[in-house]
């Protein structure tokens, strides 16, 4: 281990070796940057979290009422979940992740936001495939309350609607399976999804076959590696009242 780089943990998974790393970049000062890597692919960095946080703020801004029950699909480094818990209307947050190792990093507080999530009684980790649970309308996301419906579902797993962490995830992005997931939303419930790309018209059209309203937001943030701006997107969809 050096001062500038440390591999905190590395474990096998169904998708390949997954590792948690911490590094410092001298040009950026004394800032610890946490990274999650799957095989040779970088999944998440604490250096760029603006869009992950915006997924929560933009999605929850469209919800109605109080005592919200919310699902976050994809734990990552915890930024979407922690941003959601900053909304005082949250009554319960289920964070679903297929990788038990990632949940363990948070439970063991190997990542900075683990302590925040563990200390909040509204937060609960669910180990399972988001995509399998999303299309299981009888069982659903909450193993303790089968068939439960939610005020919002916030998804950040795949890179985009056309670039998948796992090729099997492609099956989710159809009208049929999006509609199955929408059955787990309450009337006027919200589905929001992060993408690394700019909004894609064909995916917006697909979402409109299921949801009453669909809005796409471009989230901009400074990227020091480019000495300029980078962008991600957040799709925010609202189910009909009926």
Task: List each language-model region with its residue ranges.
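Class I SAM-dependent methyltransferase Rossmann-like catalytic core
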Residues: 12-23, 36-67
């Amino acid at each position: 281990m050096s001062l500038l780089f440390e591999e905190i943990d590395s474990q096998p998974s169904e998708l390949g070796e997954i590792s948690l790393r911490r590094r410092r970049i001298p040009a950026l000062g004394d800032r610890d940057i946490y990274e999650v890597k799957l095989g040779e692919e970088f999944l998440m960095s604490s250096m760029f979290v603006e869009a992950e946080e915006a997924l929560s703020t933009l999605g929850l801004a469209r919800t109605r009422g109080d005592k919200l029950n919310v699902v976050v699909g994809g734990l990552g480094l915890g930024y979407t979940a922690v941003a959601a818990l900053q909304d005082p209307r949250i009554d319960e947050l289920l964070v679903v992740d297929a990788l038990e190792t990632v949940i363990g990093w948070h439970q063991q507080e190997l990542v900075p936001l683990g302590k925040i999530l563990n200390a909040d009684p509204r937060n609960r980790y669910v180990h399972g495939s988001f995509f399998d649970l999303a299309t299981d309308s009888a069982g659903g996301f909450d193993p303790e309350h089968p068939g439960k419906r939610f005020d919002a579902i916030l998804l950040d797993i795949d890179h985009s609607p056309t670039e998948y962490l796992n090729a099997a995830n492609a099956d989710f992005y159809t009208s049929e399976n999006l509609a199955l997931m929408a059955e787990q939303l309450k009337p006027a419930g919200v589905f929001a999804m992060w993408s690394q790309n700019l909004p894609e018209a064909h995916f917006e059209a697909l979402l409109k076959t299921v949801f009453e309203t669909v809005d796409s937001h471009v989230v901009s943030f400074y990227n020091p590696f480019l000495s300029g701006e980078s962008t991600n997107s957040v799709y925010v969809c609202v189910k009909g009242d009926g």
